[in-house]
């Protein structure tokens, strides 16, 4: 939605595909002498092709720990260097990372009469246990998403149905839901 509203591309990587150490080469390219050296990396190539984008790293907690070192380079210097030493300019991308770290606390109510810890705070506490401080300190913000209420889901659905109805009307098609 963000990329669409900004009129820029969304580049998405499912980080569960990068759990093993050797998969880092898929992102930035294989080292010299290895198969695929000439191919470059999926991430570095994507950033070079669309430097003005929303880069979504989905389920970041599943990525191999060495990938976080690569991301530190992006967050510190707005540059990502591939296997051949070519630099990808990251100054104009919006980096968003999703995580399910702490999700187990989403449905837990506070325990005890004097409990001051909200589910959001419990979730963020787990995030701090999952990721290293040097990684977390480079993030602009951490946003906790709570379950959508039935009322909110109805509002979203109504809006989407209105938009669909408007598009269909342009093609002289009517939509009737019962």
Predicted feature locations:
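AAA+ P-loop NTPase nucleotide-binding core of proteostasis motors
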Residues: 1-178
